[in-house]
Amino acid sequence: MKKILVVEDEEGLRLLYEEELKAEGYDVLTARNGREAIQQLEQGKPDLIVLDIVMPVMDGMEALGRIVGKERKIPIILNTSYPGYREDFMSWAADAYVTKSADLTELKGKIRELLEKKGKNRS
């Protein structure tokens, strides 16, 4: 079972993502901010990370920089309500960029795509 780390400060969204991704057959870990995400990484590597950008304690851009510096092989999807971040230089380090929506179809599709790509790169 593929393991996904969802990093989201809004509890309602975090629970929605967790529920929806578990229904898709994924093992889901959650974190409320970038610092918790880094701690989760130290406990075990997920197969993919869904990362919010605007969060307290440590924002997604700082977390992205730290994660990429340590674990470049883990695909990262930036997931935010603010489409302007797509232009941020640091966001280019992510594997995908998805604007938040109550409909998780795009996010789920991007997760499948990146996990399939990661699986092919291992072969």
Briefly describe each language-model feature range.
Residues 77-79:
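Hydrophobic/aromatic residues positioned on beta-strands within the core alpha/beta folds
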Residues 33-36, 59-62:
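Acidic catalytic/metal-coordinating carboxylates
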Residues 15-23:
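Charged docking surfaces used in two-component/phosphorelay signaling
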Residues 25-32, 40:
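Short hydrophobic/Thr-rich beta-strand motif most characteristic of the beta2 strand and flanking loop
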Residues 55:
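Receiver (REC) domain active-site loop signature in two-component systems and cognate sites
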Residues 52:
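Active-site residues of response regulator receiver
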Residues 62, 82-109:
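Alpha4 helix (beta4-alpha4-beta5 surface) of REC/receiver domains from two-component response regulators
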Residues 8:
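Conserved acidic carboxylate
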